[in-house]
């Protein structure tokens, strides 16, 4: 009797789109298997009236899903990598990281068509301290206003709540098929202006360490280059013990055999932004070295001050 594979997913449109994309990829390689999605509501989905940095803790969008894995009510889970804490629940592993979508953030404008057209004092919607800090460094005149909800909810709020612009991950728009939407006024934010979050644009497929059949299956959709880059980023995040309450960014690229990684830590208003970068062959070493460079520049002081607020 063939095994039915139960896939854990948050119930947002984006999460379900991502989970179905993974299932369709696996069906190409394993047509004999049946797949079924089990929708799971997480703490981050339930708490919508405060920013994630104020909720605190790690794994706000994954803890309940990981519990379902441990309880064996699902066989694997599909996460946005940037939501996955640097340390997984015991007994769980990341079984595959498919090829990364765009890692960039992007502006979605209300009236104008470009960042340079936004007037003094424009109201920008983002609940990400990472985005806010880097944007305020570039444009301290901006007023940052928190915005929560799924990607479609935030797009509705752009007009309903009179934001001049909101910031979204480009990967989410791409996976929803909305980059081709001619009614959206979009502009990519280059990493020089806003370095992406660790793992941004990548998916994490998490499973039980002991489930060899699922692990073998997931290997078929793993993308080696993405995995190497994300490894550097996540080692960096773990070294700094980062979470959503700290403006931390990290982005790696690979060319030939070399990994280039840039990391950043800042304070909430962008008045202090510390940066470091390294290039080398070993992604773990590179991630660690960049974290150590930032700690030597005073990142630990910034992190501690933000945690004590």
From Swiss-Prot:
Miscellaneous remark of the record? The porphobilinogen subunits are added to the dipyrromethane group.
UniProt lists the family membership as follows: Belongs to the HMBS family.
NCBIfam families in UniProt = hemC
Name the Gene Ontology biological process terms.
Answer: protoporphyrinogen IX biosynthetic process
InterPro entries for this protein: HemC, Porphobilin_deaminase_cofac_BS, Porphobilin_deaminase_N, Porphobilinogen_deaminase_C, Porphobilinogen_deaminase_C_sf
- Give UniProt keywords alphabetically: Porphyrin biosynthesis, Transferase
> Cofactor(s) for this protein?
dipyrromethane
S-(dipyrrolylmethanemethyl)cysteine PTM positions read 244
**In which pathway is this protein known to take part?**
Porphyrin-containing compound metabolism; protoporphyrin-IX biosynthesis; coproporphyrinogen-III from 5-aminolevulinate: step 2/4
Q: Which GO terms describe its molecular function?
A: hydroxymethylbilane synthase activity
Q: What is the lineage of its organism?
A: Bacteria, Bacillati, Bacillota, Bacilli, Bacillales
> What is said about its interaction partners and assembly?
Monomer.
Would you name any one GO CC term?
cytoplasm
Record protein name field: Porphobilinogen deaminase
Provide the function of this protein. Answer: Tetrapolymerization of the monopyrrole PBG into the hydroxymethylbilane pre-uroporphyrinogen in several discrete steps.
- What note does UniProt attach to the cofactor annotation? Binds 1 dipyrromethane group covalently.
Q: Which Gene3D superfamilies match?
A: Periplasmic binding protein-like II (3.40.190.10), Porphobilinogen deaminase, C-terminal domain (3.30.160.40)
EC number per UniProt: 2.5.1.61
Q: Which reaction does it catalyse?
A: 4 porphobilinogen + H2O = hydroxymethylbilane + 4 NH4(+)
């Amino acid at each position: 009797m063939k095994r039915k594979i139960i896939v854990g997913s948050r119930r947002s449109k984006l999460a379900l789109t991502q989970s179905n994309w993974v299932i369709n990829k696996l069906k190409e390689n394993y047509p004999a298997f049946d797949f079924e999605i089990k929708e799971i509501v997480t703490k981050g989905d339930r708490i919508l009236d405060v920013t994630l940095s104020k909720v605190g803790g790690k794994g706000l969008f994954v803890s309940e899903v990981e519990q379902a894995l441990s309880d064996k009510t699902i066989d694997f889970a599909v996460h946005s990598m940037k939501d996955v804490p640097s340390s997984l629940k015991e007994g769980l592993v990341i079984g595959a990281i498919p090829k990364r979508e765009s890692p960039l953030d992007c502006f979605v404008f209300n009236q104008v068509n470009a960042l340079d057209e936004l007037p003094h004092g424009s109201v920008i919607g983002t609940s990400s301290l990472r985005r806010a800090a880097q944007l305020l460094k570039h444009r301290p005149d901006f007023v940052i206003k928190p915005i929560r909800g799924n990607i479609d909810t935030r797009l509705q709020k752009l007009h309903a709540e009179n934001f001049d612009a909101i910031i979204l991950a480009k990967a989410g728009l791409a996976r929803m098929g909305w980059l081709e939407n001619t009614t959206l006024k979009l502009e990519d934010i280059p990493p020089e202006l806003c370095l992406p979050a660790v793992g941004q644009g990548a998916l994490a497929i998490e499973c039980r360490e002991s489930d060899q059949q699922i692990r073998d299956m997931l290997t078929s959709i793993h993308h080696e280059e993405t995995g190497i880059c994300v490894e550097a980023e996540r080692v960096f995040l773990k070294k700094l013990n980062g979470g959503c309450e700290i403006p931390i960014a990290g982005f790696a690229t690979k060319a030939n055999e070399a990994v280039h990684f840039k990391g950043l830590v800042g304070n909430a208003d962008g008045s202090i932004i510390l940066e470091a970068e390294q290039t080398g062959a070993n992604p773990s070493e590179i991630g660690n070295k960049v974290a150590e460079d930032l700690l030597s520049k005073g990142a630990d002081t910034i992190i501690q001050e933000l945690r004590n607020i």
